[in-house]
């Protein structure tokens, strides 16, 4: 069957769970039905793969699971199905947990946190410092992972269930060049000096 797509929005970000929003035309007013919504394709928990490209040359740009499924109907009878998706790593954000990590490095802790989820894989830069004990107290695995990554100056990126935890690369050639007026669709940049101090003085003792 053919499903009419209104829009697809995919969001990737550093230290963020990737997500996608799919808007589809849906609604059979004479029969009071929503056939696309009633099907199993977009039910919560369903695995979604989004491919994009030109002609027959497409590649996967997002893979995740449906986390939210909603119907919207406007006054002009414009009805649509809105599907919110998240990368499978969203499971790490569910529930607050407690754990003790004894004689462990941060890289070992991060790998262990990710390894607790069968749908995820990891690529974690090795760290050197071993701690006698670290405590995860009433904190989701995702939040604790971000905390330990930040301690080491690492960034967390995710693609199709693979969680990469590495230091940012500030040298080498750019992997992408965008040109104003050619391929830059939208851009927003701000400089906010509202909380900028002209002078900072500190006093400390030991």
Label the predicted regions.
Residues 30-121, 134:
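Surface-exposed cap/loop segments at beta↔alpha junctions
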Residues 200-206:
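Charged, gly/pro-rich, cysteine-poor intrinsically disordered low-complexity regions
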Residues 73, 80-89, 124-189:
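Short beta-strand-centered interaction patches in the first periplasmic/extracellular domains
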Residues 99, 163, 189-195, 205:
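Helix-rich terminal scaffold detector
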Residues 1-44, 86-90:
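Juxtamembrane "anchor/assembly" segments of surface/extracellular structural proteins
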Residues 4-6, 16-20, 44-46, 60-62, ...:
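Envelope-exposed proteins and targeting segments
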Residues 63, 107-110, 142-146, 199:
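Extracytoplasmic/secreted envelope proteins and their assembly/folding machinery
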Residues 13, 25-27, 53-55, 65-72, ...:
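Solvent-exposed coil/turn segments that connect beta secondary-structure elements
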């Amino acid at each position: 069957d053919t499903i009419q797509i209104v829009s697809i929005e995919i969001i990737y970000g550093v230290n963020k769970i990737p997500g996608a929003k799919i808007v589809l035309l849906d609604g059979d007013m004479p029969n009071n039905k929503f056939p696309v919504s009633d099907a199993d394709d977009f039910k919560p928990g369903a695995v979604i793969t989004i491919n994009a490209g030109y002609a027959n040359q497409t590649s996967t740009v997002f893979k995740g699971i449906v986390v939210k499924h909603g119907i919207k109907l406007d006054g002009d009878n414009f009805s649509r199905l809105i599907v919110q998706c998240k990368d499978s790593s969203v499971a790490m954000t569910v529930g607050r947990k407690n754990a003790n990590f004894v004689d462990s490095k941060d890289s070992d802790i991060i790998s262990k946190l990710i390894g607790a989820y069968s749908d995820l894989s990891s690529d974690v830069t090795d760290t050197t410092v071993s701690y006698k004990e670290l405590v995860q107290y009433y904190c989701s695995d995702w939040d604790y992972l971000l905390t330990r990554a930040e301690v080491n100056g690492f960034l967390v990126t995710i693609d199709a269930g693979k969680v990469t935890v590495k230091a940012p690369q500030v040298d080498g050639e750019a992997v992408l060049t965008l040109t104003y007026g050619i391929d830059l669709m939208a851009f927003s940049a701000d400089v906010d000096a509202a909380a900028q101090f002209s002078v900072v003085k500190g006093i400390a003792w030991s």
